[in-house]
Amino acid sequence: MLDPVPARSNDDVNVNAAKEKGELLIQVLSNFDIKATLIDTHIGPAVTKFEIRPEVGVKVSKILNLADDIKMSLAVKDVRIEAPIPGHNAVGIEIPNIKTTPVKMKELVSKIDPGDKSKPLLIFLGKDLLGNCVTCRLDKMPHLLIAGATGSGKSVCMNSIITSLLLRTKPDEVKMLLIDPKKVEFTPYHKIPH
């Protein structure tokens, strides 16, 4: 879990694909008489977001209505269109990466100053689209509900939360009571001092 983070082998594949898909995206929009400029590309762990700026006079709703056409033209499983991006003069179009890049716990932990004890209940949830560490303070949440379909990552999320707490607190600072009806998910934590 805290092994050294290997070099990202998927980055080159996703960077090359993003360049091709970005050019193709502008061409697809042009085919539907939408003139736009690609202004930025953000490659995240699972999706790539293209920020495009349509020419003056292009209705945002016209771009939204092209989701299925964009999906087919780019030959991707899904497309998400954020029109407009809040606070920006642009439209965001997200497509899945060819290769997903796993987010390692060591990457997240290394972003936090180990000497900073002001947020002992800070938990690591992953990375956002821009690759920034996503954290939240468990002590500031009145409630926390984790739900999802089978195989969607609920147990991975719980393990990330528990590991975050174990890495940042001492046994006299946090006590845990874990209830595991299946007697499978939390067995690795059976002998923790917390």
Model segments located where?
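Ordered, soluble secondary-structure elements with a strong preference for glycine-centered loop motifs
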Residues: 11-19, 57-65, 146-155
